[in-house]
């Protein structure tokens, strides 16, 4: 029998506020942020303002995928809340292993608790808006089969986020662009428009 009460799962890179997430039955798996003084959970005990402050001080925090334990705990919380199915839309697999982590957990859960996991091929605004649109579709009564077979793939395929950055320094330090590209862009004062390639990496 197809799930009737459907929850949504995403990760902290969707940049959804706690209020928006709670209002829309969206559960968040926090990525880990590795800093000089320890490990933090994104959006839980470290926030964007903290990260920007560290960057300005010369530190380069690194992201890491959530632990299997934390992802499993969120799924257990969803089940305990009375939901009987989950649609998960995760950060682009070209940037993180979060999608594959949740996919493996979903495979282990079997058919007893259906979890359909999608690679957003996106992040931040693109990922978050996809999840919010699915929340609206669920409120409007869209059924499980339509959501997982058609609607979610359509939303992902039709989402094209573009963004720019003030400096190329952190993209270079994080390994997202090469040193030559970053140096040339800085010297020429170029601020490129960045988006996601079909493989989910930044281009």
Sequence positions of predicted segments:
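N-terminal glycine-rich phosphate/adenylate-binding segment common to multiple enzyme folds
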Residues: 70-102
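Alpha-helix boundary/capping residues
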Residues: 58-59, 78, 154-155, 159
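Mixed-charge interfacial surface used for oligomerization/domain docking
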Residues: 2-4, 13-27, 31-32, 38, ...
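A short glycine/small-residue-enriched secondary-structure motif
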Residues: 46-52, 81, 103-108
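N-terminal glycine-rich anion-binding loop in soluble enzyme alpha/beta folds
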Residues: 6-73
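Short secondary-structure transition/capping motifs
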Residues: 40, 60-67, 90-95, 119, ...
